């Protein structure tokens, strides 16, 4: 990126901040702020340890020194402008969840639009199934944000979690990932005796904790068992038995499980009560089922494996309403209802369709506002929103 491109981007960002309001987080004066400027994007040097006392002070700063990227801390500090974490005096932090398309399976074969579609499905599942149903957070205690890049953030501002330290937040991460779920803790034998029609069997299996909460991993396991057995039950006998033998089952257990798989009433009991009307040694079957459940339902959180975003109590997160300097898209705050129909390639675009002259340095395919632009190297005119995207990505330079 050359100097005239940086100057052009800086002025277009300044114009945006002069006419638009950003989302000011609660406790503004207790937040640390950090910025990366257009002149510094090559080395990605962040200016941290800033503090603002009012919304007006923040707005003036954004207009006078328009950044490429703007961040605020998830944490609240007594002295947010202090140069060291110890001197800042940590008071608490929002609980942050960061889902990024880079962490989705099969992402290498997706277009940008497909990545955004898939990560939206994940963030909806995180909010509805895990944060609301399982953990009991209320929608009004969450701020949902499109990151402006490849994913979404959820800020949970429930005061019950504000003072949680990293180990407790790590436990929440582990829950979302299904870490620590083991078959011998999930499945228990009961003394219940059931009538199979031809005989009476004792020691059937039950999914532990099924009735304790309306959601939870126990019900996901039950759902997965029913789906798996229903699939197998629809196969011809030979194929069904072969599929069950893959679970290292004895012949007698294969026959029993196949009977359950083809009995709607038995599947209903698994789905509604967590009751698996089978006896015998089924540990291998349960281990495989549990692994499949975790793989299917776990949340793909962004962040390094040793320090995910959620567990990091001192992390900076993008300022909602700011511009993402790597895409030119708006970091867009959303309600849960708005998220349903939100399309980043339409709704997060803030620049115009007016033509801008650029030198394309790398060929690219750009999806924008319902159109696909196949851009070749060389000088040409493009809609401003496409040109801004390419310049922010380092694939084009401004040509006056």
UniProtKB/Swiss-Prot annotation:
Task: List GO terms (cellular component aspect).
Answer: DNA-directed RNA polymerase complex; primosome complex
Q: Which UniProt keywords apply?
A: DNA replication, DNA-directed RNA polymerase, Magnesium, Manganese, Metal-binding, Nucleotidyltransferase, Primosome, Transcription, Transferase
Highest taxon of the source?
A: Archaea
Kindly identify the residues recorded as the active site.
98, 100, 306
Its cofactor is: Mg(2+); Mn(2+)
EC number(s) from the headed UniProt entry: 2.7.7.-
GO MF terms, alphabetically ordered: DNA-directed RNA polymerase activity; metal ion binding
GO BP terms: DNA replication, synthesis of primer
Q: Which InterPro entries match?
A: DNA_primase_S (IPR002755), DNA_primase_ssu_euk/arc (IPR014052), DNA_primase_ssu_PriS (IPR023639)
| Complex and partners | Heterodimer of a small subunit (PriS) and a large subunit (PriL).
Role this protein plays: Catalytic subunit of DNA primase, an RNA polymerase that catalyzes the synthesis of short RNA molecules used as primers for DNA polymerase during DNA replication. The small subunit contains the primase catalytic core and has DNA synthesis activity on its own. Binding to the large subunit stabilizes and modulates the activity, increasing the rate of DNA synthesis while decreasing the length of the DNA fragments, and conferring RNA synthesis capability. The DNA polymerase activity may enable DNA primase to also catalyze primer extension after primer synthesis. May also play a role in DNA repair.
The family classification in the record reads: Belongs to the eukaryotic-type primase small subunit family.
Q: What is this protein called?
A: DNA primase small subunit PriS
Taxonomic lineage is: Archaea, Methanobacteriati, Methanobacteriota, Stenosarchaea group, Methanomicrobia
């Amino acid at each position: 990126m050359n100097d005239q491109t940086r100057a052009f981007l800086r002025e277009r960002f300044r114009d945006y901040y002069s006419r638009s309001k950003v989302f000011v987080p609660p406790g503004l004066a207790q937040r640390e702020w950090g910025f990366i400027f257009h002149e510094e994007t090559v080395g990605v040097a962040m200016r941290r340890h800033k503090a603002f006392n009012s919304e007006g002070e923040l707005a003036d700063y954004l207009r006078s020194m328009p950044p490429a990227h703007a961040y605020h801390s998830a944490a609240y500090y007594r002295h947010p402008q202090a140069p060291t974490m110890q001197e800042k005096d940590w008071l608490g932090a929002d609980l942050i969840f960061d889902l990024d398309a880079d962490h989705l399976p099969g992402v290498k074969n997706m277009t940008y639009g497909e990545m955004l579609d898939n990560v939206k499905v994940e963030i909806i599942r995180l909010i509805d199934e895990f944060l609301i149903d399982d953990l009991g957070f209320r929608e009004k205690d969450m701020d949902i944000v499109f990151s402006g890049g490849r994913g979404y953030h959820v800020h949970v501002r429930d005061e019950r979690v504000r003072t949680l330290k990293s180990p407790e937040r790590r436990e929440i991460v582990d829950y979302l990932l299904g870490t620590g779920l083991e078959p011998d803790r999930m499945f228990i034998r009961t003394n219940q005796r059931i009538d199979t029609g031809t005989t009476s069997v004792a020691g059937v299996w039950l999914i532990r904790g099924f009735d304790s909460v309306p959601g939870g991993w126990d019900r996901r396991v039950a759902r997965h068992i029913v789906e798996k057995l229903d699939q197998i039950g629809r196969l011809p006998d030979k194929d069904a038995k072969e599929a069950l033998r893959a679970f290292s089952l004895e012949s007698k257990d294969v026959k029993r499980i196949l009977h359950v798989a083809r009995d709607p009433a038995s599947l209903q009991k698994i789905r509604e009560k967590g009751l698996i009307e089978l006896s015998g040694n089924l540990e291998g079957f349960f281990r495989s089922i549990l692994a499949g459940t975790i793989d299917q339902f776990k949340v793909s959180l962004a962040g390094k494996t040793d320090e995910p975003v959620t567990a990091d109590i001192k992390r900076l997160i993008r300022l909602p309403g700011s511009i993402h300097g790597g895409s030119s898209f708006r970091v867009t705050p959303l309600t849960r209802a708005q998220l349903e129909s939100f399309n980043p390639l339409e709704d997060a675009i803030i620049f115009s369709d007016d033509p801008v002259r650029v030198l394309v340095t790398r060929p690219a395919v750009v999806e924008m506002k319902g159109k696909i632009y196949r851009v070749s190297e060389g000088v040409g005119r493009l809609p401003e929103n496409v040109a801004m995207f390419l310049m922010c990505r380092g694939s084009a330079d401004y040509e006056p």
